[in-house]
């Protein structure tokens, strides 16, 4: 099973590399600290609302694009982590029918 894609991987592989944009340039042109961008790309920091709005404006995306990517990553990672516990939960409708 493939690991979920972090927003940082998405940023680097789908935006920065193909567009030839450096992390330094992104930082300078968006006002996002370079250290924050680096940490997001390495998967050591989550995307915040501030970062989302700045990246969305810069890349011409709908507000929330990066936050949705962060939430999708978080949900998939957590689901994998607690899958055995989730498998033990009986949905309420099935529990009532039993």
What is the role of each PLM region?
Residues 68-98:
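Short, charged recognition helix plus adjacent turn
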Residues 20-39:
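Short alpha-helical DNA-recognition segment
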Residues 7, 36-39, 57, 65:
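Residue-level recognition of specific faces of alpha-helices
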Residues 33, 44, 73:
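The DNA-recognition helices of helix-turn-helix-type DNA-binding domains
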Residues 1-21, 68:
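A short, Lys/Arg-rich alpha-helix, primarily the initiator
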Residues 44-57:
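Short, basic-rich loop-to-helix N-cap that marks the start of a DNA-contacting helix
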Residues 16, 27, 56:
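The alpha-helix within a helix-turn-helix
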């Amino acid at each position: 099973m493939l690991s979920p894609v972090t927003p940082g991987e998405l940023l680097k592989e789908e935006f920065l590399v193909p567009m030839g944009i450096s992390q330094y340039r992104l930082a300078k042109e968006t006002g996002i600290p370079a250290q924050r961008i680096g940490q997001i790309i390495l998967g050591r920091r989550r995307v915040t609302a501030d970062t989302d709005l700045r990246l969305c404006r810069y890349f011409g995306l709908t507000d929330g694009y990066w936050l949705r990517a962060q939430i999708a990553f978080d949900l998939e990672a957590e689901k994998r982590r607690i899958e055995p516990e989730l498998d033990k939960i009986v949905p309420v409708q099935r529990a009532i029918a039993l």
